[in-house]
């Protein structure tokens, strides 16, 4: 399950593992969820009966991505402390921490009492149109959708011109799937906040790392 960040459906897990779709698989997934190894969610844009299962245990993720295939390299971790390999892990780990602290994020946004669902969404691109992927989507019963971008940085995060364009594309792609009554709030979840600048005005809501541990 560590091979796909967004997770897998029951059918995909059954096909990959050879386990039949039945009580045994259901019990296994339920036990893993109860132990906080995985979480489940309904992917936005798919039938409500569809459930995705996503690995969220940080040790398992780190082991499978960066240790399992380098078991004989005793110095792999220390040799790569400043490499792009572990920098990529920082981003992955921060996103998983966000998934694990959904209730705290709701609290920081001031919507702890609003019924919500957490999801992810992606649409494939075509020759005419670029695709889009959103890894953290909060769909609220008050007709607001928080499109969340999770960014790990060692200082306040700076939004570039190119990134603002990417964010606007994601907003427009998502807007095309919503009802006219729904509005989108671009929400940045970062370690130390968003740096004020020419392109930061696109952000409507912010959540900082410190908010996740209150």
Could you say what each language-model-derived stretch is?
Residues 31, 39-214:
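A cross-kingdom feature that marks ATP-driven nucleic-acid transaction machinery
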Residues 7, 19-22, 142, 157:
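Alpha-helix boundary/capping and short turn/kink residues
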């Amino acid at each position: 399950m560590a091979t796909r960040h967004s997770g897998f459906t029951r059918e995909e897990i059954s096909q990959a593992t050879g386990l039949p779709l039945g009580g045994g698989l259901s019990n296994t997934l339920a036990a893993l969820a109860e132990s906080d190894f995985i979480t489940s969610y309904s992917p936005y844009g798919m039938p409500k009966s569809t459930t995705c299962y996503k690995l969220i245990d940080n040790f398992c993720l780190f082991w499978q991505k960066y240790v399992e295939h380098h078991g004989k390299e005793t110095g792999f971790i220390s040799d790569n402390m400043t490499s792009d390999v572990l920098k990529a892990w920082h981003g992955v780990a921060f996103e998983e921490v966000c998934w694990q602290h959904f209730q705290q994020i709701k609290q920081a946004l001031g919507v702890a009492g609003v019924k919500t669902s957490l999801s992810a969404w992606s649409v494939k691109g075509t020759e005419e149109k670029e695709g889009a992927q959103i890894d953290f989507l909060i769909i609220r019963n008050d007709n607001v959708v928080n499109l969340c971008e999770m960014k790990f940085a060692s200082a306040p995060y700076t939004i570039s011109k190119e990134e603002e364009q990417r964010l606007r594309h994601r907003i427009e792609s998502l807007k095309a799937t919503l009802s006219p009554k729904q509005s989108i709030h671009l929400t940045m979840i970062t370690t130390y906040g968003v740096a004020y600048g020419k392109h930061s005005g696109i952000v409507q809501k912010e959540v900082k790392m410190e908010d996740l541990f209150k």
